[in-house]
Amino acid sequence: ACAFAIGSSYAGKCAVTITSGPGKALKTELIGLAVMAEIPLVLVDVQRGGPSTGLPTKVEQGDLLSVIFGEPGDTPKVVMAPATIEDCFYSIITARKIAETFRTVVVVLTDANLATGQQPFTRPKFNPAWLAPPIDQSPIPEGAKPYDWHPKTGLSRRFIPGQPGGMHTITGLAHTNNAKVAYEPGVNQEGCDFRSLKLAAFQKTLKTPTVYGDPEGDLLVMGWGSTRGAIEEAVDRARADGLRVSSLHLKFLQPMASGLKEIMQKFKKVITVEINYSDDPRHEMITEDNRRYANLAWLLRARYLVDADCWSNVHGQPIKPGAIEQMMRERVAALKETEIDTLIER
């Protein structure tokens, strides 16, 4: 299915392939091909419980790290996660536009909650802008190359088979800007540099996400995907009782929008709520040297060097607002106790 989608896109018609975590693993080599050849590809990963056959009909958010880092070599791609069923409808349109504009792979992470759930929303009025543009058959300017990377953005014109002057080879091997296979020193480095620049160029188009609640406080709860509703309901309940808690939900997970570090720095503690595995820090064998964090928490700690904690499970069930609210209360209470202890020590 992934190969068919790549072939369709190469011919000028962007296509999507839909799978779950194990299916995505089987598509690893083809995803790498789409990245290397810079062929637009949209892949939807409907996450479910793992590992192996795991919980094939239950919910999980365990594929984030494997989607970002799972291919051999450097394979920059856009990763996004809709939060509602309505969001899924619009996200796939957005994903296609991103894939075609930046000649890249876009992975849309959904999960079993979104795949099997129901949500009423107003039927959208058809917008012609949602459709892919007609296949470009205009002549290629003389001297243009299939990978004529722009020095600032890494972007290059997309050649479509049949365009006069556009004949070229397509390959998954390291190649020059003229699509010629090459092993000279620096060729692969140059290609990797420009493909990474495309991700940076796309990141410049993203808006900083909005904090749900006050922009500063004691606790910031961060999440992604289908957990948004439960998190925001829990925040509403806690804030109604005077707790200084807020939440921030991320739609784009690779790359992340600018301004996130500044948001996190305005809170005393940052914690992620996720449906994937993390170690229980209370266990006697778990230390800071060996603790495994939930997927998003791991990314935040690595990228922003913040002391982000996590609260997650792999029960195969949606996380309930009441459980999140209870966790918030416990974390805020722990913060207050720490502040009191610090004052006493002084």
Language model: regions and residue ranges:
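Homeobox/homeodomain signature
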Residues: 16, 31, 54-57, 75, ...
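Short, conserved catalytic or adaptor-binding loops enriched in Gly and charged residues
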Residues: 66-73, 301-304
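Flexible, low-complexity linker and terminal segments
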Residues: 91, 96-346
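Hydrophobic alpha-helical context, especially transmembrane and signal-peptide helices
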Residues: 3, 12, 75, 86, ...
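Short glycine-enriched loop/turn motifs at secondary-structure junctions
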Residues: 73-74, 215
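Thiamine diphosphate
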Residues: 1-69, 78-99, 240
